[in-house]
Regions:
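Small, basic N-terminal interaction modules of short regulatory proteins
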Residues: 20
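Extracellular/periplasmic head regions of type IV pilus-like filament subunits
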Residues: 37-41, 60-125, 133-135, 142, ...
Length: 153
């Protein structure tokens, strides 16, 4: 086999691989634009799931703070006590596009997670979440800051 024939076969194989890759990419996009529209929804669901998990993490940290010092705590105190990591430091930390706020005193706490887009933490989630010390149930509102009166998740 001559060098020209080998180069021709390699070129044809590369072209076939390129075509196969294009076909695979097209089929993976699930009917073109439908697949592309599904991606932001999946990311939004992941952001919301992360916010809900963070609320539960905060609830666990609050339980530990109450047991240790007989009082609930704000985010900075929970971080200083080692119950939350540094991502939660500050008055209203923003994690994965959700702004967390906490109101805490000796006897109770309430925490909200509201979508907030920042340059470093864009969000695709749209629902608002609430959890407090009374029952540990996550409540959800589709349009505004959630409260205890909103439906449970």
């Amino acid at each position: 086999m001559s060098a020209g024939t080998i180069a021709s076969h390699v070129g044809n194989a590369s072209l076939l691989l390129l075509l196969a890759g294009c076909l695979l990419l097209t089929s993976c996009s699930s009917s073109g634009s439908d697949g592309l529209r599904a991606y932001p929804k999946a990311v939004g669901a992941a952001d919301e799931a992360s916010a809900i998990q963070n609320l539960r993490t905060i609830a666990n940290a609050q339980t530990q703070a109450k047991a240790m010092r007989n009082s609930y705590a704000d985010f900075n105190a929970l971080v200083q006590l080692g119950f939350l990591d540094e991502r939660f430091a500050g008055v209203n930390p923003n994690l994965r596009g959700y702004r967390f706020t906490v109101v805490a005193n000796e006897n109770e706490y309430a925490v909200n997670a509201d979508p907030e887009t920042t340059q470093t933490n864009p969000t695709t989630g749209g629902r608002h979440f609430y959890l407090d010390s009374t029952d540990g149930v996550v409540h959800v509102s589709p349009t505004q800051t959630a409260t205890r009166q909103d439906p449970a998740l």
